[in-house]
């Protein structure tokens, strides 16, 4: 039976506390938590454009506060956020964290975020001492399965590879687990989860299309594409003189742009 949880209006990216009694989420540019039994939501930190979070067994929440940032950490009881990871050369984002058993080591996705796409993605692990090791090139959104496997997304498919959580190393070849899982090309986020008992739940589908074209639509319904390049366009508005189009592009950050119809330029 599904029921709404008060205090979670506008919530995205929900995640449970290790004991299942609290729900973490993002809303209104903030990281928050709320009891599953009800009560007021508690703000834990700022997160203007979040890219995932994980609640560790030692009372720490790892989270990505924005599309272009390393990971941060905050005590689940509240307090100041602190840096958790550092960006390596050639990347501008660490995101989609997953604490390993014990709550000290951490899996995450690293890469280069560009408009509407996460490129050069790879799965990395950081030890309790802060040492980083890159594990799987081309993978995203890792999760640890109690069977001793690292599960991750690659091309909207779920893959699994044997993983030693003590040595923080893969041990063997990856095999496909599920074909066709909903994945965002802009964030790498993939719609699946694994319970502590090993059950896997996912949303069937594939890579979501975020690219759209701007088009003129005549009164007879005929469409004529404009020369503007594809983007994640939203809410286009034509200027009073008919020469420009104001439009939002919702990619790494949602921003307003102007398309000049006479020059075919977007700025």
Regions found by a protein language model. Name each.
Residues 1-267:
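Acidic, proline/glycine-rich low-complexity intrinsically disordered segments
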């Amino acid at each position: 039976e599904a029921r709404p949880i008060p205090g979670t209006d506008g919530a995205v990216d929900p995640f449970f506390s290790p004991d299942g009694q609290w729900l973490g989420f993002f809303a209104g540019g903030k990281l928050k938590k709320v009891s599953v039994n009800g009560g007021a939501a508690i703000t834990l930190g700022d997160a203007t454009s979040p890219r995932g979070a994980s609640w560790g067994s030692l009372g720490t929440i790892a989270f990505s506060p924005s599309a272009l940032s390393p990971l941060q950490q905050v005590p689940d009881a509240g307090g100041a956020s602190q840096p958790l990871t550092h960006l390596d050369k050639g990347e501008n984002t660490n995101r989609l964290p997953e604490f390993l058993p014990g709550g000290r080591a951490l899996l995450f996705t690293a890469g280069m975020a560009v408009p509407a796409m996460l490129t050069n993605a790879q799965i990395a692990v950081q030890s309790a001492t802060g040492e980083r090791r890159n594990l799987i090139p081309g993978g995203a959104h890792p999760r640890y399965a109690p069977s001793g496997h690292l599960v991750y997304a690659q091309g909207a498919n779920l893959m699994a590879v044997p993983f030693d959580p003590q040595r923080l190393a893969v041990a063997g070849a990856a095999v496909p687990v599920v074909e066709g899982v909903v994945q965002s090309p802009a964030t790498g986020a993939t719609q699946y989860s694994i319970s502590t008992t090993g059950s896997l739940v996912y949303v069937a589908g594939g890579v979501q299309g975020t690219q759209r074209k701007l088009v003129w639509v005549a009164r007879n319904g005929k469409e004529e594409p404009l020369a503007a390049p594809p983007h994640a366009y939203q809410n286009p508005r034509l200027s009073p003189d008919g020469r420009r189009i104001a439009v939002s592009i919702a990619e790494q950050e949602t921003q307003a742009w102007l398309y000049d119809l006479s020059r075919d330029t977007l700025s």
